[in-house]
Amino acid sequence: NHGGDHTIYPDCRPAFVDAMSAAAQAGTFEDVTIEAPYTNITKADIARHGKQLGIDYSETWSCYKGGEVHCGQCGTCRERQEALREAGIADTTEYENPA
């Protein structure tokens, strides 16, 4: 999840992550926590961090539609393209319909 997901997906909100972490601790005998380190940063910031870690984004998947290649048109494909562009990272992803 990332900062932009909060209004769209209730399970990406900090309150949900905190509640799930509390439930995991209450329901186990272990010291279990759920961490969501990217909850309050942008997708572009996440992409920059990934680049620092050496992530090859052509080897990652975002598309909701599945298939052999990214569709290039669904919301996650568009967010991916925007985040990589904002982060200054060349997008080498193969898209069926490039934006």
Mark where each language-model region is.
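Nucleotide-activated chemistry modules centered on ATP-dependent adenylation/adenylyltransferase
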Residues: N1-A99
